Swiss-Prot record:
Protein name: ATP-dependent Clp protease proteolytic subunit
Catalytic activity from the UniProt record: Hydrolysis of proteins to small peptides in the presence of ATP and magnesium. alpha-casein is the usual test substrate. In the absence of ATP, only oligopeptides shorter than five residues are hydrolyzed (such as succinyl-Leu-Tyr-|-NHMec, and Leu-Tyr-Leu-|-Tyr-Trp, in which cleavage of the -Tyr-|-Leu- and -Tyr-|-Trp bonds also occurs)
InterPro entries, per database record: ClpP (IPR001907), ClpP/crotonase-like_dom_sf (IPR029045), ClpP/TepA (IPR023562), ClpP_His_AS (IPR033135), ClpP_Ser_AS (IPR018215)
Source species, domain of life: Bacteria
PROSITE patterns the record matches: CLP_PROTEASE_HIS, CLP_PROTEASE_SER
Signal peptide start and end residues: none
Compartments (UniProt record): Cytoplasm
Subunit organization: Fourteen ClpP subunits assemble into 2 heptameric rings which stack back to back to give a disk-like structure with a central cavity, resembling the structure of eukaryotic proteasomes.
Function: Cleaves peptides in various proteins in a process that requires ATP hydrolysis. Has a chymotrypsin-like activity. Plays a major role in the degradation of misfolded proteins.
Pfam families: CLP_protease
A single GO cellular-component term on record: endopeptidase Clp complex
Keywords in alphabetical order: Cytoplasm, Hydrolase, Protease, Serine protease
Organism from which the protein derives: Lacticaseibacillus paracasei (strain ATCC 334 / BCRC 17002 / CCUG 31169 / CIP 107868 / KCTC 3260 / NRRL B-441) (Lactobacillus paracasei)
Length: 196
């Protein structure tokens, strides 16, 4: 993927940044693509850096992701909760699966979606092979993970565990308005002036 470069004029001349570094100067982190360990490490490093730089200012996490590895997502979620800075989450395009949990895990009152965003919640998926006991262990682990994810979503949305369990039984797609009504986000951003 070609990463655009931004050129800025400074007192010492011109300075070129890749677009993501330039956005980071404005406390903006882009979470796009599949959630995996590499993405998580990058996002976590940026969260920690911005929090150390100024923990009184908000961090803006823009999310456009189909989801991915749960442990990678939970590492980011734990870091979002660990740092002092408020983390505004903004869905752009798609926030699905683990990405929807990260969207809902932003600072309450500061979780947003753009009007044409799609949000998807569902139960964790996985597979196992090997001996029967190994398959049983893997099955128990995915059930434990599902309970954990349901609790995280219930805490973030105000929905009951029973409702979350029912709604995540199959893919549950939501528009920005439906996600707001459900409690996954707090507001819909039509333009930057409506952002808090």
């Amino acid at each position: 993927m070609l990463v655009p470069t931004v050129v800025e004029q400074t007192s010492r001349g011109e300075r070129a940044y890749d677009i993501y570094s330039r956005l980071l100067k404005d406390r903006i982190i882009m979470l796009s693509g599949e959630v995996n360990d590499q993405m998580a490490n990058s996002v976590i490093a940026q969260l920690l850096f911005l929090d150390a730089q100024d923990s009184e200012k908000d961090i803006y996490l823009y999310i456009n992701s189909p989801g991915g590895v749960i442990t990678s997502g939970l590492a980011m979620l734990d870091t979002m909760n660990f740092i002092k800075s408020d983390v505004q989450t903004i869905a752009i395009g798609m926030a699905a699966s683990m990405a929807s949990v990260l969207l809902a895990g932003g600072t309450k009152g500061k979780r947003f979606a753009l009007p044409n965003s799609t949000i998807l919640i569902h139960q964790p998926s996985g597979g196992a092979q090997g001996q029967q006991t190994e398959i049983e262990i893997a099955a128990e682990e995915i059930l434990k993970t599902r309970r954990k994810m349901n609790q995280i979503l219930a805490d973030a949305t105000g929905q009951t565990i029973e409702q979350i369990k029912k709604d995540t039984e199959r893919d549950h797609y939501m528009s920005a308005q439906e996600a707001k009504d459900y409690g996954l986000i707090d507001d819909i951003l039509v333009n930057k002036n409506t952002q808090k």
